[in-house]
């Protein structure tokens, strides 16, 4: 190492040391100075990448000064300078750009706009290389603003008593490194009372002038509510300079009261019976317990002990509910609600705790009378105005605990009747049919009951064996596929007979007796006084339609099956009975679908002999039984009909016995549909053909008595034993007429045979396929002189030639000129027209033939 090199290194080392000392002590414009992180004051920002920072706020709390790389800045800030720590060089905000996101590459602006995109910005922007300077932009926000009483409980939105002289306003916000926070308190007239309500001495980062900064810790402004008048106040906070917009500000309200008594506030003055009524206890210190009661005189007459126990709901801040009885001999808290007589109940109570500034509870009005009801609020337990009536389990101590205690507040509210509607069934109802029952009820109605009325009282209608229908949480009710006449109650019987009646729906709470059971009947006056509605319903008798599928009145014994379809509203099933001429019987039960239709395919009739037969559909009618007392069900009827076949009776005898014991029986309302048919051999025939031109098609038509869909008729074009073309069909109507088109695109002219085959039966017919079908050739000849047209039709056969001539009189034109044929001149040879010449030629040809 040379002396020169050593000297240079020494000089360089000395320069670096001096520069470090200078860099550690330099003060920048605006009061910014480098310091160790542990010595920073509340106004300084931390540089997360180093132990150094630059102050960004002067002593008056305003944003001025410089920040170094890694600092966090906020939307809306002004007067912020970026400087490098190592050389004090100022960095232009425009050189920093967004490093990622949908706005990647967008430059940073100064002043920072209120809508500047949040996130990181650096000198490299979206590039991955390490940047020499970068900052992070955040949205300024107040994250918490609460008014707290002496016990440090949140009473925001509630009541702060003037005696709470150690109350405070607590704030959390994220821009403490950029700006101080400013507090403003206004009364209900908008007058600023901040200086008046602030306590003389402040701590927790607050200053006497209503500003403050406690860094990352909660900022507290100490207040004395006794310094201001009672009333409603609004508390607001925001940044002292730039950050006074959007989420950087927050407001809250509080009611300052000089009263020592708690107050009761109802959510509504009028409520529909069955709805829940919210109440709020205000103006009471945090943690107090208050008793709220409703006297039994406001209960519904039909309420039971269990119902009364539900009046005060165990929700919100309610910690205990119950009933107190006073039966002259004792006053006590009820343990057994089910066995408690409503006449012994004195009142229902709730114990409510004051939490977050107030106490919230709720009343179930379903069990209150539809009139005006009173609610009482008692002083807090264990205070100068009331004894300690709440035990350590947060329960009322005993039934006499509130005796002799004056209330802090009382108020009343009106309970009105609600609405209930029955949307279905309405209009017409077929006896025995299934319907959907649905409708709507007002809030708080848990169950509804269906009734029917003829002339007197409303009679109970059971719903699938139940006496009531549950109301869903959306205040609707529905039961599907219900037979209204199925039960054994009076209303079921009413709806089992044709006529016009009143159908009613009523809240279950209005339809129960003193023991809580649903009443079997309710007189019209009581029904109308309850939460109910009625509509008219017309009950009609059952009906029956049916059609058996035959083909031209026949059923082929090759099939030995028959189909039937029809309608039977109000029935679950019907009986199909097919009777042969020799006394054979086929009996089958057929189910009726929910849409009142039935459809049964492939009923086996193989036991029947050929000949005439009858098919019947038999329904039991609205009474559900066959005949007067022949059979009570389809299965019973099947056994009965089986008895009719003993002794080798004829088909007519069996039919007579069935009719006499069902539809023709005394007082019977049975219904029957009868259809005659013949059971015969299967037969498929060819009746006619059309077409037959080579290259075209041949249509083959015929009749059959075979069952469509289950059978296929195949038509084959044969030449000798060779099959030329084939086609088929499995569709034809009840007249048995079928049709098949056989393609002739590859068939040469000649004589052929067509064969129709249904699988069991065949039929044949000879046909001729020609090269071209003959069509009449018409020539029109004009006769211009007499305005006539002659049409000659020639048909040539092997034996003779026939010439027909017809003339038609043409209409003359409007100007009287003679008609002419299209495209021809109106002139002709006088006396010797083309028509005359044609006749002459034909005559000569005929003469030549006769000579030959």
Curated annotation (Swiss-Prot):
| Positions of transmembrane segments | 829-849
Q: What does this protein do?
A: S-layer protein. The S-layer is a paracrystalline mono-layered assembly of proteins which coat the surface of the cell.
Q: What is this protein called?
A: Cell surface glycoprotein
One GO cellular component term of this record is:
S-layer
Q: Where do Low complexity bias regions lie?
A: 785-823
Q: Which residues are glycosylated?
A: 36, 339, 398, 438, 513, 643, 727, 751, 787, 789, 791-793, 795, 797-799, 801-803, 806-808, 811-813, 815
Pinpoint the site Not glycosylated.
Answer: 51
Q: Spell out the residue ranges making up region: Disordered.
A: 84-131, 772-828
The source's superkingdom equals Archaea
What does the UniProt record tell us about how this protein is modified after translation?
N-linked glycan at Asn-36 consists of a glycosaminoglycan chain, constructed by a repeating sulfated pentasaccharide block composed of GlcNAc, GalNAc, Gal, GalA, 3-O-methyl-GalA, and sulfate in the molar ratio of 1:1:1:1:1:2; the other N-linked glycans contain Glc, GlcA and IdoA. O-linked glycans consist of Glc-Gal disaccharides.
Provide the organism lineage as a comma list: Archaea, Methanobacteriati, Methanobacteriota, Stenosarchaea group, Halobacteria
The protein's matches in NCBIfam families, at most eight in alphabetical order, are given as: halo_sig_pep, halo_surf_glyco, PGF_CTERM
Leader sequence segment:
1-34
| Record's compositionally biased regions (Polar residues) | 115-126
| Stated family | Belongs to the halobacterial S-layer protein family.
Output the GO biological process annotations, alphabetical, semicolon-separated.
cell wall organization
Localization, UniProt: Secreted, Cell wall, S-layer; Cell membrane
Protein keywords: Cell membrane, Cell wall, Cell wall biogenesis/degradation, Glycoprotein, Lipoprotein, Membrane, Proteoglycan, S-layer, Secreted, Signal, Transmembrane, Transmembrane helix
- Report the residue ranges where the short sequence motif PGF sorting signal is annotated in this entry: 830-832
